[in-house]
UniProtKB/Swiss-Prot annotation:
Any Pfam family: NTF3_N
The keyword Transmembrane is annotated on this UniProt entry: no
Protein name in UniProt: Neurotrophin-3
Gene source species: Xenopeltis unicolor (Sunbeam snake)
Known role: Seems to promote the survival of visceral and proprioceptive sensory neurons.
Keywords, ordered alphabetically: Cleavage on pair of basic residues, Glycoprotein, Growth factor, Secreted, Signal
């Protein structure tokens, strides 16, 4: 079942949110059922075997990369919510062939589309090569007055006392 266009007309934001909540809850419930079956009769959890721990390690690695495995969803749930369709969301019974591109997860600006993107210089390694004036950074210990960034004459303190005098 695939839904890629808004052929049913525009939907309110509340109805779309309720559909997404139902969709997520159904997926979460399906993932929790096998974990509950791993408990013994007296109510204590059994220790996981190595074969069961390996898929969890793979899932943790996928989670760290930002890729979450697709949760299987009943076709019945999709049929019930058929009136909800979106041009940005593809509902399908097939799993994706590959994880989402990593460049989308590396840049935090992609997640916040309302903020403007910061401009960078063409070649970062050439920054400052054609500067207007040269600057020197060194400690000056024998000055008693100086000019601040606004052009005002200021007194340079020889020592700064901190704490109670």
């Amino acid at each position: 079942i695939q839904s890629t266009s808004m052929d049913q007309g525009s939907l309110s934001e509340d109805s779309m949110n309720s559909f997404i909540r139902t969709f997520i809850q159904a997926g979460i419930w399906k993932n929790k059922v096998p974990k509950q079956a791993a408990r013994t009769k007296d109510g204590t959890q059994t220790t996981a075997k190595k074969t069961e721990a390996e898929p969890e390690a793979t899932a943790n690695k996928d989670f760290q990369l930002g890729f979450q495995p697709v949760v299987s969803v009943d076709a019945e749930l999709l049929r019930q919510q058929r009136r909800f369709s979106s041009p940005r969301v593809l509902l399908s019974e097939n799993t994706p062939l590959e994880p989402p591109p990593l460049y989308l997860m590396e840049e935090p600006m992609v997640l916040n589309r309302t903020s403007r993107r910061k401009r960078f210089a063409e070649g970062k390694s050439h920054r400052g090569e054609y500067s207007v004036c040269d600057s020197e950074s060194r400690w000056v210990t024998d000055k008693s007055s100086a000019v601040d960034i606004r052009g005002h004459q200021v007194t340079v303190l020889g020592e700064i006392r901190m704490g109670p005098s």
